[in-house]
Regions:
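Short, low-complexity, intrinsically disordered N-terminal peptides in bacterial proteins
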Residues: 1-7, 151-154
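A short beta-loop-alpha structural element at the N-terminal edge
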Residues: 7-21
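Conserved beta-strand in the GNAT
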Residues: 59, 65-81
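C-terminal "cap" of GNAT-fold acetyltransferases
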Residues: 105-119, 124-125, 130-154
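A short, internal acetyl-CoA/4′-phosphopantetheine-binding micro-motif in the GNAT/acyltransferase core
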Residues: 76-87, 111-112
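Conserved acetyl-CoA-binding loop-helix of GNAT-fold acetyltransferases
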Residues: 82, 88-101, 120, 124
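A short helix-loop-beta-strand connector motif used in the catalytic cores of GNAT acetyltransferases and
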Residues: 48-59, 76
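Conserved GNAT-fold acetyl-CoA-binding loop/helix
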Residues: 20-49
Length: 154
């Protein structure tokens, strides 16, 4: 599975369920100890009624299947999830470069503190951790960390 064989394109309404399913599989694989705040059907409904129609949503498509999803909400990189077999193949890098091109003035994002691979990934792409919380402000009640790009001056 080479990321060069994937197409990145804006999501259409018909992609909502497939994008949500990528989110569900990726979340479960990457964060097995984190309690999800919503069941599968609620996540699919959220993608269909909020994420795809109201936010700048991109999908990665390989052989006709959605294998990744990127969501930009204003200056926030709100979602970046890959089907587990597609991790480590450069697709996430392509999504981050796309987000940086789309928001050259800067991006911010939140990820869970427990998600070391995601944190290292964003740090490799020039994001800097600027805030940590105890998680009481997110639905999962999981300690999180806010990243910004470009990194603020020291």
């Amino acid at each position: 599975m080479n990321s060069d064989r994937t197409t990145l394109r804006r999501a259409h309404a018909r992609d909502a369920v497939d994008a949500a399913d990528v989110w569900l599989r990726s979340f479960s694989a990457a964060l097995p100890t984190v309690r999800r705040a919503h069941d599968d059907d609620e996540v699919r409904d959220w993608f269909a009624t909020v994420v795809v129609p109201r936010q700048e949503t991109w999908v990665a498509v390989a052989a006709g299947s959605v294998v990744g999803v990127l969501v930009l909400d204003g200056e926030e990189l709100a979602q970046l999830y890959l089907d587990p077999p597609w991790r480590g193949r450069g697709l996430g890098d392509r999504f981050v470069r796309l987000a940086q091109r789309r928001r050259p003035s800067g991006l911010s994002l939140w990820t869970f503190q427990i998600n070391g691979p995601a944190r290292r990934f964003y740090e490799r792409h020039g994001f800097a951790a600027v805030e940590r919380t105890d998680g009481l402000g997110n639905e999962e009640r999981e300690p999180d960390v806010r990243y910004v790009w470009p990194s603020p001056p020291l």
